[in-house]
Amino acid sequence: MNPTRTNNRSSRSRAADSGRGGSRFSSTASARSAAPARSGGSGRSAGNGRRPAAVQGEFALPVTVTPALPAVEAFADLDMPGQLLAALTAQGVSVPFPIQGATLPNTLAGRDALGRGRTGSGKTLAFGLALLARTAGQRAEPRQPLALVLVPTRELAQQVTDALAPYARSVRLRMATVVGGMSIGRQANALRGGAEVVVATPGRLKDLIDRGDCRLGQVAITVLDEADQMADMGFMPQVTELLDQVRPEGQRMLFSATLDRNVDRLVRRYLTDPVVHSVDPSAGAVTTMEHHVLHVHGADKNRTTTEIAARDGRVIMFLDTKRAVDKLTDHLLASGVRAAALHGGKAQSQRTRTLTQFKTGHVTVLVATNVAARGIHVDNLDLVVNVDPPTDHKDYLHRGGRTARAGESGSVVTLVTPNQRRDMTRLMTAAGIVPQTTQVRSGEEALGRITGAQTPSGIPVTITAPVAARRERSRSASRGRRSPASAARRVSAHQSSFDAAA
């Protein structure tokens, strides 16, 4: 398939404004235009902790001209290479999610796309299959990728790469993952060897371009995944600089849970008459997600948090700072709970290992900062706990997006002390959510009914690395140690705002 667009994008002005981007644990396609904008699901009852209305303060979806191509109900109905269809079957993927069935007929035909929806809606394959199908059969020159996926965090970059890798292999396309915190030399080598598809965080990709290790002039398909998070993390200047370097007539796809001012600017500046598929940011909440605000007393919050963590099953707990995360993790381990910390102060290898342990169940409680957990996708996770309430309704929606993914059920629980109640009410109003509100104390039946809380064993536990990881570290050590100066030189001089913020 030829990824070049027939419309002349370069004739359109690009002068639009660019984006700018209290507990003891707390810290204070043939068709070239898009479908008419579709709104999210209608509101449901307001008293059962579900999401009754659209998020306040968002911009309207763009109005486009030509209707979208009709949605499909089976991948076999799509104009995709047979190898991709076979790979879908091999991966056990049989029926497209709504966002896939709606957007793929159009993106396979080369149209720009705007997908508005929460994580877990199936958007990775929605953009990934179109990107791979339209790039198949081409070969990239050294340092000149043909397709680009920009994401806000390293973890999300790795998850996108892992999700698309079997499909890329099926059509003989090479992928490279370009993120901070990893060897920039190895990433440069991968680009020099030729990679048709690059999945990148903005900061590291800019570093490689500045070094002369990558050029974007041949990129014909560009995807921005979780664009609102990139804006929140301050990446908009880098994102716009990168988008200005790709082929001006190329295809653009943008996916975002919310459509705020910065994302709206990206849509107006870089998308040409996009096909629009809108899933309410918490559409899963309408039928599968419950929202609970638990009023707790400050003196009891520590014990309440510990009992929730001791539940059967996995849970992600959010706190505001790295110090608070480490403090709670240590307390949970001492109480007999298999917990691990995730924040920007941890080495990338340690974060990757922690995520693997959490996904496999070796760790049952992931204690994380808001930024560090962005982009984490874990299947069958049914509880997210805001130990420290978020300060922004978008952060609340992103935290909640870790559960009730892909139609699964889940709950978001926020612990609120008396002095936080007014702010939490305002936040929920801004998010368009009417939660179930309950006064709870540790050890009470209501807490157990809502969260599965139970008394911890009290027997301290230690989380050790899996045997394979220990063997790998042993092999690395046997090859000799580098000097501190040498090791320091291996760290990129340009660290992304992720580490500073997490």
Regions found by a protein language model. Name each.
Residues M1-A102, D320, A500-A502:
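N-terminal intrinsically disordered, low-complexity tails of helicases
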Residues N7, A31, D330, A465-V467:
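Intrinsically disordered, low-complexity repeat segments enriched in small/polar residues
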Residues G19-R24, S42-S45, G49-R51, G115, ...:
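Compositionally biased, intrinsically disordered low-complexity regions
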Residues P70-I459, R489-R490, F498:
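Conserved helicase RecA-like core
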Residues P456-S474:
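Long, compositionally biased
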Residues R471-A502:
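The feature captures the C-terminal accessory region of ATP-dependent helicases
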